[in-house]
Amino acid sequence: IAALAGAWDMFGTQLTAAMTIEKLDDHLWSMEYKGDYGFDGFLEQGGAKSDAEMGDYIASFLSHGFWKPDTSAAGGNYGCSTVAVTSPDGAALFGRNFDWEECDKMLVHTVPKNGYESIATCNLDFLGFGEDWKPDGSMGDKFMALASVYAILDGMNEKGLCVADLMVSHEEGVDQNTDKPDITIVSGLRLLL
């Protein structure tokens, strides 16, 4: 019983989040993550200079160092756009397109211990778990899908702040050397939300 209690203490938040994954439509899932998803720890350890470094942190945090999934970088040509408008009744509306022919998407609802509640989207293909991977198979597949909390492409928080990564294929990168934690585009979006 002590071992089970220890395992729950270590993985309870992640297991609870994994159990919320629901298929909404072809290529569309949703999940809710309540609690600490490790973002403060990510910043405290210096952030990450690359998607690969960020992936290493995510795998280590979610698995507590017990395993690391095989991943490969997603690529391709793309260009995204967003729209923000006010409806006739005064409501603020925010939307985006996913400029991929076909991709698996996750609606990610987060309620962090230290931050604002938000809803965001993730292109699951960008997690790099392979073309045949889906988040609704085994518990292991669902657990891997928790990485979508970090790989968001847009979102809105409870205060109304909307952010988006408008992707355009390019080769040049930006490298700034400061005393602040390193962040990638997607970790910057998570930080803002």
Mark where each language-model region is.
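N-terminal mature-domain region immediately after signal-peptide cleavage
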Residues: 3-193
